[in-house]
Amino acid sequence: MYLCPNKPKLQSTKNFKIMDYKIIDIEGVGDVYAEKLTAAGINKVSELLEKCADPKGRKALAEATEISEKLILRWTNHADLFRINGVGPQFSELLEKAGVDTVKEFRHRVAENLQPKLEEINAQYNICGRVPSIAEVQKMIDQAKELEPKMTY
């Protein structure tokens, strides 16, 4: 079912569970940004979400790394989506292109409407190896409904 075959181990923190990818695994981070984030103490996706879930944290990281707040917000949104089982780097990118950038947004979607949109976008941009079925998207939506929102703006 998973769209990312080499998924890391599930890590738990006090408020959420997340697949603990390396920071460089987020689409668009790359070596240069990963080095800046690592120098600021951000090595894992869970650390990014923990530190940057609120505007104050994003601003502080932007100042420390000289990375734009806009990019940090985008990456933190992806990190938020990683909390959903089956969502990894590529699928979070596809979801973003479909207008779903956080767990809170995902929970309000209708699988029967979202899944064809994902198919359409993936056909255009070739982001993922495969797009999940309507049933798989529904399971993700159901999980999003159970997760506590992390992101604040």
What are these regions (language model features)?
Residues 14-153:
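C-terminal extensions
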Residues 2-18:
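Short, Lys/Arg-enriched N-terminal segments with co-localized hydrophobic residues
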